[in-house]
Amino acid sequence: MYDLMIKNARIIDGTGAPWTLGDVAVQDGKIAAVGSVSGAAKAVVDAGQRYLTPGFIDIHSHSDGEILRCPTAESRILQGVTTDVGGNCGSSVAPSEQYPAMADYLAQVEQARPSINSATLVGHGTIRNAVMGYSRAEATAQEIEQMRKLTAQAMEEGAYGISTGLIYPPSCYSTTEELVQVVNAVQPYGGYYATHMRNESYDLVKSVEEALHVAKEAGVRLQISHHKCTCKADWQVSVKTTIAMIQRARRQGLDVTCDQYPYSASATSMSSNVPAWAFEGGVEAMLQRLQDPETRARLREESNASHVGRWGDIYVSYLYSPENQWMIGKSITEIAEKLGGKDPADTCFDIVLAEKDHVGEVNFGMCEEDIEYIMAQPFVMPGSDGEAKGLDAPGKPHPRNYGTFVRYLAHYSRDRGVLPLETAVQHMTSLPASRIGLADRGLIKAGMWADLVLFELEKLKDDPDYGNPQQACSGICQVYVNGVLTAENGRHTGARAGQVLRRK
């Protein structure tokens, strides 16, 4: 007897093939049979010809620490995400003082019993900080060797690759040659290199050149993170150049793919607007520099020069002090005016200081034409750049945390026709699974883990928006993780059947 039988479903198997009407049987957490399946089951679900797909795989998340604080991961499960890869943008939880080894961190995640499957990369910024702190100095040969050893250890203990965050300290202090040597440490393990590039604005093309160079010289697969152009003057121009560069690299044998989130706004920490040199010595050193009048004047000048016409596009998404709650959902320009016409850079710096760097932003900087052009490429997959959150998360976090995958399907595939439905599902399931190296997930096929999403296409809607992000998406009927029903009609069942995934 099967544990579960889902009958009469339009099965989209994740390969890109047209849907077929059939049944899926589940036994011991895995798919036991697909097609016209006979036999009894402990639980039978009549899909009513709704669509059944593999669970969605988020190749670019930041759930590392959040999965320990919010193991039920409503923001993931309620949009159909069953597997989540953290450690992106150069930042991972391990190795650190709290978790000296990746094995320590992954063991802690297992103890937390998450509702989703959890995998991770090791962050170059985290590695560099462990060896050099927040030093702007060029790494010595000995320091690079230490970084390589820590990277290799993380891979031995289950990481799937390495990431960089080249706009964030301390990753941004690295030379290209340092990156080549440290990234190469994942090569013997078949790991991949995911990069938040040095510049996604006016120097986007140069940044892609560097990413391609690092991957080629290091001998690894490349994942360009959240590919986009944030320079308005280069909209509908730069990404056509970079996509052509990627296509050419692929023809020449370099295994490079991209991910993106389907929104015209990004999100990050408010302190990303502080010039990177101010972080030398760490966050506390940066906060002290913001309080020094002479240093602050220089920072103000540099920040305003690089933000011409942009302060009005940057909104406070969350902060914690009670006296500043009124700022959430308002732009830096609005806040500056409310404070009596204050300089916008000073306004930003004062918020960072008041919140001790615990403040986030949403930044509107991309155009729809670029989003769709990138999305249409066969080597691009969705990645939320979000994290595991509850429906009671504070502030106004970016809606990508809660709605990326449903928006991809409902708005861009169904409504806009950017990708056929079966292709869109492939890009959300088997494409990231193969990229990461998950041989037993991403397809509806006998022997695969039963991560499944049942949805009603006509009712799919990414309800989470910038004004009210903390909500479930419409149209997701059921979500199974390793064969266990974990979400149903917008509600979490309480199940916590996720697994910690380690590189094998």
Task: Please tell me what each predicted stretch does.
Residues 92-217:
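Hydrophobic, small-residue-rich alpha-helical packing segments that form membrane-like cores
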Residues 1-5, 10-55, 462-465:
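Histidine-rich, glycine-flanked metal-binding segment
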Residues 344-352, 421-429, 444:
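Short, well-structured alpha-helical segments that form the helix of a local strand-helix-strand
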Residues 12-23, 333, 358-365, 369-371, ...:
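Acidic, glycine-enriched loop/beta-strand segments at the rims
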Residues 115, 121-122, 126, 130-141, ...:
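Active-site neighborhoods of metal-dependent hydrolases
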Residues 9, 24, 29, 49, ...:
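Divalent metal-coordination and catalytic microenvironments
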Residues 9, 286-292, 372-379, 385-387, ...:
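C-terminal cap of metal-dependent C-N hydrolases
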